Amino acid sequence: MIPAKTLGAVRVGSVDRIRPAAEALRDIVADLTGLRCAVTDNIAVQEPMKDGAGEILASAVFGFATGDDARWWRFPQLALTSPLPMACRFESEPFWCNAQGIHTPTPNLLLSALDLSNFRERALTSAAIVAPVHLPFGQIAAASFLSPDPEVDDLSAPFEQHGEALALLARTFVASYVKVTERRRPSVATALLSKREVECLRWAAAGKTNDEIGTILGLQRTTVRFHIRSASVKLDAVNRDQTLFKAAQLGFLAMIR
């Protein structure tokens, strides 16, 4: 159990608190496990996390300033090839991984299908404990905890002892950071779609045309178009594709298997 005071130290309450919270996360993790932190608030974007003064946390706080150490945040396209962020797309629990496999508390068949070849070169580490953080709007963040010795390839012991604590610390820091740096319009919180609008969007997301959706739901094509257009206005979207994207971000569209 992590004391409330410890969690409070890594929680970002304002932009001015970003730097102290990041430093607290770094120090708490080092004291607890001896590991380093590498944190990103969104594996899909190129912009690194920054403090209130615009300093990049990866270099200024977490110590990834030069050489290979800095590659993971200086070249964000690595997120497209590294097995670490890829695993975070399919897993929500903390895990540890090395070239031999991705080790989770609960078996995950999707992870077993990931390519781990050339692990050291692609992941920029021999082993890592990873805490995925799944946030609103489909945003995926991740915190990786790494040995100071790049040759260490077994983190099973610290994962067994502290994996859940590391995940809680990471979630508290990242989720609060995202809240204080939020740039979306508040109006997005008022978007309420009707049952029929969601049905039409769900089938549209499955690739169905308005005619096909009308046949499935027993509606006229013009009625289907009306419902999709209505959803578009509510979601402040400019076209059908953006409407589907925003509806998916907000969790209105269930997966069609």
Language-model region placement:
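The N-cap/first-turn positions of alpha helices
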Residues: 196-200
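Conserved binding/catalytic microenvironments
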Residues: 102-108, 133-147, 158
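Juxtadomain coupling helices with adjacent low-complexity linkers
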Residues: 1-22, 31-32, 141-143, 147-191
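Basic, Lys/Arg-enriched C-terminal extension of HTH/homeodomain DNA-binding domains
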Residues: 233-257
